[in-house]
Amino acid sequence: GSEPLLLGEIWQDGSQFFTGDAFDSVMNYKLSFALGDLFLDKGDAKAADYELTVLRQNYPKEALYDLMNIVDSHDTVRAIYKFGGGSDSVAQPTKKDFDYNLGKARLKLAATFLMGYPGMPTIYYGDEAGQYGSSDPDCRRTYPWGKEDKDLIAYYKKVIGVRNAHKDIFARGDVNTLKAEGDIYAFSRKADSGKMGIVALNRGKAQQVTLPVSAADGTVFTDELTGTKATVSGGQLTLALGENQGMMLVQD
């Protein structure tokens, strides 16, 4: 449009800026804390969901759906580094002094969440390629040209593709928490047409998860990331979630 989007770098609740005379929206550091610190790092889905629910209640829908959703930034520890147990320090690590594979697995979960949640999913440059780093300024390392993690890039492309293919659901649909307990966090998105999508995340060991859903019995959902199908029975959808696995399911 002819008017630029005014986005504020605000770390706290940004409600006071949505009165029409300040910002259109803000960087969503509140989501970064809930998703990154409480859920993916500490395994407390209930606490994470509480923070996100308060956010949804406080913000006008127009601002909520325009939030700059992040999991890390130029001012924070790189997500892959934190999720892999890296230390939050101004000292620059000279080697991968963290569990890269664990960090990568949970970064994939973060990407899945961002692509399924209301707001503008934002990727801090290099996250998709496996760049790591501790506190500012170490988090501002250059892009790892020629050393990119191609598997991670492919995963980012896949979840971005799912969001783009189902914008009516994952970009614009209503959101509702289905389960938030320990290592499991799941929420639904519902388009104006009534078609549903579900994002289910497991940041722990493999387990079977049962979710309450409003869809009719016999309704089939397909995970757009793996092709796995699940059918609603008794108002519930049962999923077999692998270790550190995320799903983006869409109603057939």
Each language-model region and where it sits:
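Active-site-proximal helices and loops of the catalytic beta/alpha 8
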Residues: 1-70, 113, 130-167, 177, ...
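C-terminal beta-strand-rich structural cap/linker in extracellular carbohydrate-active enzymes
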Residues: 233-252
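Short acidic/histidine-rich active-site segments
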Residues: 123-129
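Active-site clefts of carbohydrate-active enzymes
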Residues: 64-99
